[in-house]
Amino acid sequence: MRPGIAILERCVASLDWLAARRGYRSDLPEHLITGERGEEAAFFFLRRKGFVVVARRWRFGQVPGDLDLIAWDGDVLCFIEVKTRSSKEMATASSAVDRDKRRTLRRLARHYLRQLPEPDEPNFQPPMRFDIVTVYELPGKPREINLMPAAFGWSEHE
């Protein structure tokens, strides 16, 4: 584990604990709070794996939704969808990334790529992929985080 990441993760956890202790309550519905906790856990999980996160919750005004995380895994640009669940009784977390969600993520990724600076080399595009990170926060069990690299591609027919 990278020491700086562990320290940052402990600091964030301590701040969350202090906020709860002082009575701070979010106005968000519980499922959105669970999702935010999962995205934070996924962020630190990926950082420990060596990913360089360049954006969190990236939005483009004309497209609904967001890209949860955008990160470099070596020389590969990754668009990462995080799905968090507090139960395994229903469908898997990754099954929530259905055809419509994949279409939205592809649209957002195209918009993200358009706003990047022009590369020095004409027609250069870095290798890219769409990953899914699943986070399970089951009562009485340690958090379970899994990375599914290249979970789907650019084609609509996957």
What is each residue range found by the language model?
Residues 2-9, 116-158:
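Domain-level recognition of nuclease-like catalytic cores that cleave nucleotide substrates
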Residues 3-57:
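Acidic-basic catalytic patches of nuclease active cores, encompassing PD-(D/E)XK
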Residues 42, 46, 67-90, 105:
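Conserved catalytic cores of phosphodiester-cleaving nucleases, focusing on short active-site segments
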Residues 53-55, 79, 130:
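Hydrophobic residues on conserved beta-strands that form the core of alpha/beta folds
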Residues 56-61, 133-136:
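Short, solvent-exposed loop/turn elements at beta->coil junctions and helix N-caps
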Residues 59-63, 122-124:
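A short beta-turn/loop motif at secondary-structure boundaries
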Residues 83-139:
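Catalytic cores of nucleic-acid endonucleases
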